[in-house]
């Protein structure tokens, strides 16, 4: 009975939040209210409000406010600062003419490709490769928004389609050393090499190709439906005094991430890399003019870009975090886990149930990690009791948690991309919906075809 009540409360609040956001209310305000309401109900029901890693203040009422403080400090100080730095960097690149120079140079070879959608798919594959270097979905999204998004929009790709491309790459896991993959390999009782490269990678590649094809047709359909016209930017209209080599500057953060990964050079945080990139750009600006006042004035543009990012993106991330914690403390996720364990032992049925529940949990909470970490704990027990190969259950769940995050209007990556693109999170979700569902179907089918369903098939008995 309690499980049903917790599910009902979660669903009612989710529907209410979605309704008001769709009606045009501030997403930040609506998510804050929804999250606080869930936390208050959780406290009344006697649930612990704060995560187990945080000490209680002694009172449930102050614990609720304490959690908001925790999010403000964590998301405003680490993830939030990274987002603000990237937005400030993007604003500075526009100010000094570097983005205009990228468009001028890129437009020359691209003029031979008549379809902006082919350019969009090329950008998608590049973005997927970037996920190997940047493991954070939100971090990758904001990095792509600061670098690839302006280029895509300026060569004729609609803002919605370009935002969807920036939000999509982390939907399918490629990085073999990410925390999710390491945990999944342990749950599957396989070595990391066998699990990541021999089992998961072929499925991931198939899903990425399928999602790319789906993006091509879905974005084109939506653009036609919404009467969005594509006009390749006339580069002759772009006037900039920036030298041609400035075209490399917007991509220096990506280059820095690849170089300073601990293999080729020291391992540096993305914020450190961004500071280096800003210093390089400002020094080049000084060498062009030898006008210190002009350089300092130009940097003010970057600071204002950072301030806009705090208001439009970081606070939205904090609100989304409060909402996700509310769903967790009310028992919504645990209730979904209880439903999964109530199903029978047929491998395909159990796999589909786990995939659907993981996907729903990821969509509602906006987290890819939390649902997977919660569900994966029971995989070894379920697999052994049912005679099912653990990897057969783990791989689809692993991908479903990340795919579901891309369908969530409260996930960090969707919120960040929408905020930087200045469109609704629901617009991003609509743009990613069909490609994500195509990717999910491919993952399920590929798992059924490529991964043995029973433990006996694995051991050869």
Curated annotation (Swiss-Prot):
<keyword id="KW-0472">Membrane</keyword>
<dbReference type="GO" id="GO:0015293">
    <property type="term" value="F:symporter activity"/>
</dbReference>
<dbReference type="InterPro" id="IPR018385">
    <property type="entry name" value="C4_dicarb_anaerob_car-like"/>
</dbReference>
<feature type="transmembrane region" description="Helical">
    <location>
        <begin position="137"/>
        <end position="157"/>
    </location>
</feature>
<keyword id="KW-0812">Transmembrane</keyword>
<comment type="similarity">
    <text>Belongs to the DcuC/DcuD transporter (TC 2.A.61) family.</text>
</comment>
<protein>
    <recommendedName>
        <fullName>Anaerobic C4-dicarboxylate transporter DcuC</fullName>
    </recommendedName>
</protein>
<feature type="transmembrane region" description="Helical">
    <location>
        <begin position="313"/>
        <end position="333"/>
    </location>
</feature>
<keyword id="KW-0813">Transport</keyword>
<dbReference type="GO" id="GO:0019664">
    <property type="term" value="P:mixed acid fermentation"/>
</dbReference>
<feature type="transmembrane region" description="Helical">
    <location>
        <begin position="240"/>
        <end position="260"/>
    </location>
</feature>
<dbReference type="InterPro" id="IPR004669">
    <property type="entry name" value="C4_dicarb_anaerob_car"/>
</dbReference>
<dbReference type="GO" id="GO:0005886">
    <property type="term" value="C:plasma membrane"/>
</dbReference>
<dbReference type="Pfam" id="PF03606">
    <property type="entry name" value="DcuC"/>
</dbReference>
<comment type="function">
    <text>Responsible for the transport of C4-dicarboxylates during anaerobic growth. Catalyzes the uptake of fumarate coupled to the export of succinate. Can also catalyze the uptake of fumarate and the efflux of succinate, without exchange. Shows low rates of transport, which are sufficient for succinate export during fermentation but not for fumarate-succinate exchange in fumarate respiration, indicating that it may function in vivo as the succinate efflux carrier for glucose fermentation, even if it is also able to operate as a fumarate-succinate antiporter.</text>
</comment>
<keyword id="KW-0050">Antiport</keyword>
<dbReference type="GO" id="GO:0015740">
    <property type="term" value="P:C4-dicarboxylate transport"/>
</dbReference>
<keyword id="KW-0769">Symport</keyword>
<feature type="transmembrane region" description="Helical">
    <location>
        <begin position="79"/>
        <end position="99"/>
    </location>
</feature>
<keyword id="KW-1133">Transmembrane helix</keyword>
<feature type="transmembrane region" description="Helical">
    <location>
        <begin position="343"/>
        <end position="363"/>
    </location>
</feature>
<feature type="transmembrane region" description="Helical">
    <location>
        <begin position="164"/>
        <end position="184"/>
    </location>
</feature>
<feature type="transmembrane region" description="Helical">
    <location>
        <begin position="26"/>
        <end position="46"/>
    </location>
</feature>
<feature type="transmembrane region" description="Helical">
    <location>
        <begin position="199"/>
        <end position="219"/>
    </location>
</feature>
<feature type="transmembrane region" description="Helical">
    <location>
        <begin position="267"/>
        <end position="287"/>
    </location>
</feature>
<dbReference type="GO" id="GO:0005469">
    <property type="term" value="F:succinate:fumarate antiporter activity"/>
</dbReference>
<feature type="transmembrane region" description="Helical">
    <location>
        <begin position="436"/>
        <end position="456"/>
    </location>
</feature>
<keyword id="KW-1003">Cell membrane</keyword>
<feature type="transmembrane region" description="Helical">
    <location>
        <begin position="2"/>
        <end position="22"/>
    </location>
</feature>
<feature type="transmembrane region" description="Helical">
    <location>
        <begin position="116"/>
        <end position="136"/>
    </location>
</feature>
<keyword id="KW-0997">Cell inner membrane</keyword>
